[in-house]
Amino acid sequence: QKIILWSASLVPSIYFYLFNFDNINIIFFTSLIFWLFFAVFHLYSKFHLTNNFNVILGTILIVPLWVSVVSLFLDNKLFLLFIFISIFIADIGAYLFGKKYGKNKLMPNVSPGKTVEGVLGAFFLNTIFACSLSFYVSVELLIIVAGTTLITFLSVFGDLYESLLKRQ
């Protein structure tokens, strides 16, 4: 068991050394791994979160979020703005299309108000945003559409996961 634990602790060290990770990237990488393990653990276990655990979890996870926002702000303000606008457009599209056309519930046990039509509206509005943006920036349309698609997917998934945590 000691050899397995030692090996498991050595792997990230080698990875960070080989890829020249600095402190910010270590925070990002660690939080990504933590989120992935926590999400899988939480979804497949019968573990219920207590209020104290929620406070600790929120405190741990707010640091990487803040570091990433500050890092993006310092490196590329327009990219950070693009991310926020894309998230806002996804939320607005989901709300408007869901209210107007929403008939099929996405996950009624997790978030009763979210509909498949709302999600499609989020993707549709963000695709229009990507096409409009491609006229003003020197980035290929396919890359912008891929970016807004990824952001929309993560936005919807994040909303659903947050609703799941809220319901417990």
Describe each model-derived feature in a short phrase.
Residues 1-113, 119-149:
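Membrane-embedded alpha-helical bundles of polytopic integral membrane proteins
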Residues 109-112, 164-168:
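Short cytoplasmic-facing helical segments at TM-TM junctions of multi-pass membrane proteins
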Residues 89-99, 155-166:
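Short helical (or helix-break) motifs at transmembrane helix termini and adjacent helical loops
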